[in-house]
Amino acid sequence: MARARPIPISFLPAMLLGVLLCTSATATEPPWLELHSTHFTVITDAGEKKGREVALRFEQMRAVFASLLAKDRLRLPVPLTILALKNDKPFYQMAPLRQGQPISVPGFFVPGDDQNFIVLNLFEEESWRAVAHDFAHMLLNYNYPPAQGWFDEGLAEYFRSIRVDNKQVAIGSDPELGASFSDDLLQNQRELRTSKSLTEFLGGQVWLSMADLFTMRHDTSTYQEGTHHTLFYAQSWMVMHYLLNQKKLPETGTYFDLVQNQHVPVEEAISKAYGMSSAQFEQAVKDYFHSLRALFTALDASKQPGVAASAAQVYQFPVPLGPDDMVISSKPLPDADARALAAEIKVRIPERREVGLKELQALAAAGPESHAAPKRSAEENASESNSAIATATGNELAHRVLAWDHIQHGEFDEAAEELGNAAALNQHDVWIRYYLSLLKYRIAQSKHLEIQGLANMMQDLRAVLDWYPEFADADDLLGVARTEGGSPVAAMQAERAAIQLSPRNEQYVLHLAEIYLTGKNWEAAKALLERLKASGNTQIAATAREKLGQIGNEQKYGMSSATGTAAGNLTTQKSPFDALVQDAAERAAAQTKSEAGPDKRPSQYLKGNLVAVDCSQSPAATLTIASGARTVKLRTGDFKSLLLIGADQFSCEWRDRSVSVNYKAAGRGAGDLVSLEIR
């Protein structure tokens, strides 16, 4: 028997060093990274390569979805952050619970009015596919007018089947099909799938009539869905399969116009839109379904013991963009910020909220000792600020998220204190300006008061929109502020921008109706309120019915729905956030004089030729307009806030243009611009 030889003493230091190095490498977690692609932010601890792959896959899925809707551009009015975790332990510690257990899928979506989040478990392959259904709903909500449940769910299920790599997109398979059997640890076969796939539902003899399918109510606004293993989901999926691949989306738009705007009965609308009866339409979809042999081949394979479910797709085509088409930036993210982000996501999941709050409070209290920001009331914090920014301790993101949570629960004093602490730690965080504006609005709502610090609120919201131009909620809040400030035309411009960015948001539509009421445009307000009174949101429906009842009194007695706006609301006050966007502060100061009280001068209309534009005192501008033998000079305090029609943005280079203007006279041959139309 061979004897083990002793290790020479001279080798021990080298071996010990190697062990220490290995231990150190194992113990050190990969750094957190923050990656930015064209449309998404990815936060990951899985390394830059994985982070780039996640960003690429979501950009690819976004591009494929745009092609399905035949759109050149998709809007994203709520910022989306993707948290991609390398291990399943932290993933399951924050995942939503179902019957007391974390969900089994490797990805989930957390929606919000201010931010959306996606969380992925990168320990699983292609984890992004787990959120494809919700991702489709999100993009659909922002980029397609209100539709019916079969359309939304059918398109989301179709998109859920997507597979994408660096070269090819594959789509169209049964998204609910899985293997019927699996092997346990002892290689014994056990039954795995008990629910029917969509293909199996459609293979039966009974289908819903198209009229019944198209009239079934199904709320998709909350992202809260039950099982997808139903005939409704199966038939909706196949109808959209047919419409997309037979290029019938334009006819579908016609159908929705007939049903939702012209109130044509469903069967008649099907006939007019698709050129066939409801029965013929149903048969066309059935024939299309039976022609998709790949679905039946995959179903047969899934029923065979020892054979994995087939991933064969119905359609394949080249990727719309690949790794070489992407510009993705990357930078380290402090560990405390990453932990605060994870805690924020927990706070937004009801069953995880208490754990998330404890983590945020610990992060907010951590760090070197410092003087806390002075505690004041919510009204004091919302309407005025100290000339010097107070100091605070802890993590800025944690303070900001705690402020958001306090706002959601009506704890306004606490929210104001947390925002003050966050601003003391990082006055350049634009999110603070947004949440400060939201806080002012919520205080006014809850106490039935006017919004305090209105001029600063509008200044802050303009800074937010400069940072993220597609932020619909900032446009909406700006519309509300301008309405209260006595500028209904500018308010209408902001609210319409919000609705264009998020066409299914009924709260924005309600605010637009309120702007119409303020301007006594009764018919326009009635049209919107009549639509809203049938809303699935009971609070919005009740408000719409109440306002419809008020319109008669408004018309009869001439009562204004927005009277007595205090001039003091528009007095500019010093804010700790001025340093964020100095030019916005200057524009707000320039406007203060004109916005200091309700302008009772009558509006006048003029058509003529734009001779010259003087921007020497930017952002103010003076336009010289000739109309016949008359020449007038019309001024705007901020051309970036001027209501424009017929042009995307104001230009100081305009010359010799036909224009129409609304203005308020300010002396002989002079006035203040209200709106400008380029003809």
Task: Label every PLM stretch briefly.
Residues 89, 143-211, 280-285:
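Post-HExxH zinc-binding segment in Zn-dependent metallohydrolases
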Residues 366, 391, 425, 467, ...:
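Structural marker of alpha-solenoid helical repeat scaffolds
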Residues 363, 388, 421-422, 463-464, ...:
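Canonical positions in the second alpha-helix
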Residues 27-152, 159-169, 211-226, 262-276:
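Juxtacatalytic substrate-recognition/specificity segment
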Residues 31-34, 227-230, 262-421, 428, ...:
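Beta/coil-rich, acidic/histidine-enriched accessory regions frequently appended to metallopeptidases
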